[in-house]
Amino acid sequence: MASRIAKDVTELIGNTPLVYLNNVAEGCVGRVAAKLEMMEPCSSVKDRIGFSMISDAEQKGLIKPGESVLIEPTSGNTGVGLAFTAAAKGYKLIITMPASMSVERRIILLAFGVELVLTDPAKGMKGAIAKAEEILAKTPNGYMLQQFENPANPKIHYETTGPEIWKGTDGKIDGFVSGIGTGGTITGAGKYLKEQNPNVKLYGVEPIESAILSGGKPGPHKIQGIGAGFIPSVLEVDLIDEVVQVSSDESIDMARLLALKEGLLVGISSGAAAAAAIKLAKRPENAGKLFVAVFPSFGERYLSTVLFDATRKEAESMTFQA
């Protein structure tokens, strides 16, 4: 009998489960299932690209453990995906990140031995990218993975996420709903799904406050991980059938409801994906259709954010009962 023990943590990436949404989907004429990427080894969809970008660079002979210094700007979860892979493979990693990202993300990155550089939150991801490029210019053996431009990002979703969803739904998926950060998930998984069935519709989700894919202007919002304020080069915009806008408040409310009504503790971007998918599943023309929404990350990573403000205050003010 073959051993089922993984040779290292990177072999645990992928094959995340799908689950129907029930109680939050009242009034829907279509069905909504969630792809639970918080079940990855480090609790987010970015575990896939962290591994794929490092492995791809290794295969091309661009980096070597113990020699190369990996550098990446990230809003957090890609950093974590890179960090555990770098730790397992023996790389030094420098991460630049806007100071507005949750404290949990900082702690996790530091726990993996990352050198963390915080950047001006007012400058968003552009500020983090500029700082990473500055560090790269003065770092011997430095290598930037460039998640927003790296073809290894959508490639891993084409090779794994898309096939997993197709197989998991027995090919019965009608719509794929994904928040757009780098655009890697919707581009890679979406391309695979459309190759299997050209009638599958792809729905991108972006913050209403920073709706650049819809022709709006970039702006501040609270949905960490999506709505970077620019159109990434790995995003194939032409693949997308419709962009659905959701507000930060709507996303936060839905993330809270998912915990209370579905038993799913998820991050704000999962709330955004769920809110968008439910809107689509309520349209009369979508009766009987199956929508799969990507839930990118686990809620525990957001305990210090606005998502859990009221809960945190309640927990902190509690006293013991005699």
Swiss-Prot record:
GO terms for cellular component: cytoplasm
Cofactor needs: pyridoxal 5'-phosphate
Residues recorded with modification N-acetylalanine: A2
Alphabetical GO biological process terms: cysteine biosynthetic process from serine
Location relative to the cell: Cytoplasm
Pfam families for this protein: PALP (PF00291)
Disulfide bridges in this chain: none
Entries under InterPro entries matching the protein: Cys_synth, Cys_Synth/Cystath_Beta-Synth, CysK, P-phosphate_BS, TrpB-like_PALP, TrpB-like_PALP_sf
Modification Phosphoserine, positions: S178
N6-(pyridoxal phosphate)lysine carried by residues: K46
Biochemical pathway: Amino-acid biosynthesis; L-cysteine biosynthesis; L-cysteine from L-serine: step 2/2
The protein's assembly and partners: Homodimer.
Cross-referenced PANTHER family: CYSTATHIONINE BETA-SYNTHASE (PTHR10314)
Name of the featured protein: Cysteine synthase
